[in-house]
Amino acid sequence: MPSCHTDCIEKSVSNWFHKLGGFVGRNPWWFLLVPLFISAGLGAGFYFLEEREAHGIEDQFTPKDGPAKQERHFVKEHFPQNDSEFSRLRLYNEGSYGSFIAVSKSSDILSEKAFEEIIYLDGTVREMVGQKGKTYEKLCAMKSNRCFSNAMLDIINGTASTIKNANLTFPYHNSTSNTIFLGTELGGVVLNSSIIVSAKAVRLFYFLRENNKAENDDWLHGFTQVFSNLSDELNKRQIQVSYFTSNSREEEFKENSKSVIPLFSVTYFLAISFSIISCLRLDCVRNKVWVAIFGALSAGLAVLSSFGLLLLCGMPFAMTVATAPFLILGIGVDDMFIMISCWQQTQVHDNVEDRMAATYKEAAVSITITTLTDALAFYIGLLTPFRSVQSFCMYTGTAVLFCYLYNITFFGAFLALNGSREKGNRHWLTCMKVPEPEDSPEKYNICCVGGAYDQETGKEEVMPINNFFKMYYGPFLTNTWTKVFVILLYAGYLGSSIYGCFQIQEGIDLKNLAADSSYVGSYYDNEDQYFSEYGPNVMVVVTDSKFQYWDQTARKRLDTCLERFESLTLDGRSLVAKDMTLSWLNEYVKVINPNNKTIFMDSLPAFLQRSDFRQDVNISNKVIIASRMFIQTINVSTAVDEKNMLNKLRETANGCSEKLVVYHPAFIYFDQYAVIVSNTIQNIVVATLAMLVISLMLIPNPICSLWVTFAIASVIVGVAGFMALWDVNLDSVSMINLVICIGFSVDFSAHISYAFVSSKEVTANKKAVDAVYHLGYPIIQGAVSTILGVVVLSAAESYIFRTFFKIMFLVILFGVLHGIVFIPVFLTFFGICNFN
C-alpha cells in the first residue's frame, strides 16, 4: 500500500525537540534554576491579587454588551432617578436596599402576634446605627418628604392589632388616600374573590439614597449583622425570617472564592501522592519518586508564574479562576507521565544526553499537540461576552503554556539529573552507589541493589500494568466480538448524549453564586415560593421624539401595541396582567382629551406635577423626547419563563409600528439567555476547526487527524448531554467547562492516534495493541491525576466549584473512554495507512 502520511511538520518538531533534549541533558542545572528564578520574579504579581479581584456579579456574569445594558443607558439618560421622590417601579437599576421576608410558622401571617414581631423587626432596622453613625432615617430614599415606607406597615399604621380588621384586598388594596399594590409585599395569599383570607409571608424593603455608596455599604453591612445576630431569637418566635441586601450577592460571592483555598493543599497532597505511587518501582535505582514530586512542583511553578505575570499586567482575577490551579496540576502531571513513559523506552546504557534527546523526540509531538489544543481552546474562550469566562480562559490558557515550558525545561532538567543518578547506579534516596542485582533475595534487592533492565531490549523493565495492556487488554479490544460490543456501546453513548442535549436548561440562578449555607439561599427560596406570582413590572419606553401623542390615531396605534403586550401568553398562561398596565397617557386623556398639539403640551406640565407620572415623561423645549408606560408580568417563575418572557416582550416591541423599547433591571441578567447557546456553539465550532488544523499539521496521517476531530465533537456531545442529565444548566460557568472540554477531548485521542500511526507494527490490530501498550497506562495515570486534581471540589459548598467537578469528571471519563476504547477500535477500521 502506498504511503499516505504528511509528516513534514511533525518531523521538524521531533528533530528540534531531539536537539533540545540533548541540550537539556548537557546543561540540566541551568534549566532547573532559571525557571525557579523566573517563578520567584513573576510570583511578585500576587502582591496585586486583592486589587485585581473582580467580584461584580453583573460585570462578570452578564454579557458585556447585552441589549439590556444599552436599554438601561437610554432609560438612565432620559429618566434620571429622583431620590427625593423615590419610586421602586421607576428604578433603572436594582437600587440600594435591605429586605427581609417574614414567613409565618402557622397557616396565616395576618395575625396580631406575627405583626407585633414584624413591627419589632422594623423598629430594630430603623434604630440600627452603622459604624459611620448613620441610621436609616439619615440615609433613606425619600417620598413626599419622608422615608420610603412599606405599604403593609402603612395600612396598619404601626399598630399590630389593626391587622385583624384591615379587610385587605389583593393585589390592589384601596386605602383611605390611594390604591396600594400588595403583590410584592404579601405572599402565599389565599383569596375569597379579591378579599384576602390568609397569607403566608410578608416582605419589607428599606431603600437608601444612592448618593453615598460608602455610607450605604456600611449600613447594609450592619443590616445583615443585625439579622445574623437575631437568628437564634427569631427561631423561637411566630415567624421565620430570611434577609438580603443589594450587596449580598457580591459579598457572598467574594466569600465563596475564599472557601476553596483550603482545598488547594488537599489537592496537591492527593496529586503528589498519586504521582509517587504511580512512579514507585521495586528497584531502588529505577525508582522515580523524586521525578514525580518535581513533576507536580513544575505544575505549581507554572501557576505561580502565569498568574503572577497576568496580575502584573493588570488582568482582572475573577472567582472562576480559582478552579484553574486544580486543572493545571492535572495537565502538568499528565505530560509528566508521557515524558516518563518515553524515558523508559530509551536504552539504559546510552548516556544521559542521548536518552534525553530520544525522550524529547518521542514525547515532543504528543505533549505539543495537547498543549496547543488546550491553550488554543482556552484562548478561543476569550471570544465569549462573559468577563468571568474571559478571565478564566486568559489565566488558564497562559498557565497551560507555562506548564508546557516548565515541563520541557525544569522537569526535563530534573529528569536528566535523575538519569545521571540512574546511570551511576545510585540509590534513589541516599544517592549512594549500590550493586547491580544478581541472585540476591528480592527483599534485599529492593533496599540494597538496583539498576535492573530488560537484557533483550536494553530498556527499563516493563511495568506489569503495561504488560496487561499488551498481553490482555489490547488483544481483547481488537477481538471481532469486542469490536461489535464497542460499536453498540458507542451507539448507546451517543443516543443518551443526544437525548440529554435536548434536555439542557439555560441560565444561572443567581443564588447559586453564594455558598449553600449562605443566608442568600433561604431568601431566594422564600422569594421563589411566595412571591413569584408577579414578575418584573416592565417599562415600555417610547423612544421616538417625533411621536404625536396628541393625535388620536397615533394614540390608538400605541394602545394597540400595549394590547399586544397584554395578550401575550407562555405555554397557555397569560404573561402580562391585562388590567394592571400603567400609562400616563391614558390617565392624561381621561383628564383632557385634546387633538391639538398646543393644548396638549400646554396642559401636560400641570398634570404631571400633580401626579407620580412626572418621572415618566421627558420634556425639553415643549417636545416629548421620550416617555414610558409600565406592564405587569405574571406567571414568571423559572429560568425558562424568564428567557421566553424576555424574547416575547422584545419581539412584540420590535413588531410594533412605533419605536418601543422594553426594560427592567432584571433584564441585565436575563440577557445571558439570548447569547449563551449561540456563543457556546460558536466557541465549539471555531475551536474544533482549529484543533483539526493543529492535528493535520502534527499528526502524520490526515485520516487519524479527522478521528481526533471526531473525538472532540463526540466528547462535547457526551458532556453536554450528560451534564443536563446531572442537573447542570448551560450558563457562563458550565460554558467555561465546555471550553475545557474542547482541549481535553483532544488529549487522550491525540496520544493514541499519534502512537497508532507511528507504530512499526504491520497490521491495524497490532498497531492498536501497540498504541494502548505504550500509552494506555500514561493515559490512565493522566486521567486519574486530573480527577484527583478536581475531586475535592465535589465537597465545596459552592455551585460553581461543584459544577466544575461534575463537568471535568465527565470530560475525563468520556475522554479516556474515547482514548482507550472507541478510537483504537475505530482506527482499526479506518486508520489503515502508512504501512505495507
Predicted features, each with a name:
Residues 2-3, 21, 33-36, 40, ...:
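Transmembrane alpha-helices and their membrane-interface boundaries in multi-pass membrane transporters
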Residues 2-290, 294, 405, 411-681, ...:
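Feature of extramembrane
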Residues 21-25, 76, 249-266, 297, ...:
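Alpha-helical membrane-interface segments at transmembrane helix boundaries
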Residues 37, 257-288, 293-305, 372-380, ...:
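Internal alpha-helical transmembrane segments of multipass membrane proteins
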Residues 265-278, 296-394, 403, 410-416:
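Hydrophobic alpha-helical bundles that form the membrane domains of multi-pass transporters
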Residues 286-339, 703-753:
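Hydrophobic transmembrane alpha-helices and their membrane-interface caps
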Residues 346-384, 404, 680, 761-797, ...:
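Pore- and gate-forming transmembrane helices of large, multi-pass membrane proteins
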Residues 607-736, 743-746, 750-753, 776-778, ...:
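Membrane-proximal extracellular juxtamembrane segment immediately upstream
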